Amino acid sequence: MPEYSQSAYRFGDYVAKFGVFPLGEEQKKLEGTYIKDDDPINVISQHNRDFHINNKVTYSFCAQLLQNLEEQPVDDIGVEWDEKKYPFEQVATIEFEPQDSWIPEFRVWWDDRITVNSWHGLKEHQPLGSTNRMRRVVYAESRKLRLKVNGYKDYIEPASLKEVPAPV
């Protein structure tokens, strides 16, 4: 199933929204599958774990470039940028070898200590628009609360894969 950035970002000297589209045959077979009402609450995480243990996954990473500010507003994420008029263009391929994506000690470490924030990137990839400016404030407050609840003073930013508590 495709995933989209919703909001706009700098893309070097350009402005773009991003999309990630499955390329693998096994991934494409999952399109159109649904969760049943009586499925267990952890059905998605368990299915993802089983799938990633047994399958390599490949995605097309695409950019939809801003070409017309009137039709592609940056400040109103409620306006969809027309894909027929302004198509996504592939800029990279992302591949993940089969792996256990739900190792308990890694999940706890990630949940308790890591923060994911689009404002931590390069200026060339800076988040744009009012939604992202609001996210900057909300993410900072959310991080503070999460650290306090989890009993930590600060989040960590691993300098190398050796600091990650998972086989890589």
Language-model features: where?
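Active-site-adjacent core segments of small-molecule enzymes
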Residues: 1-168
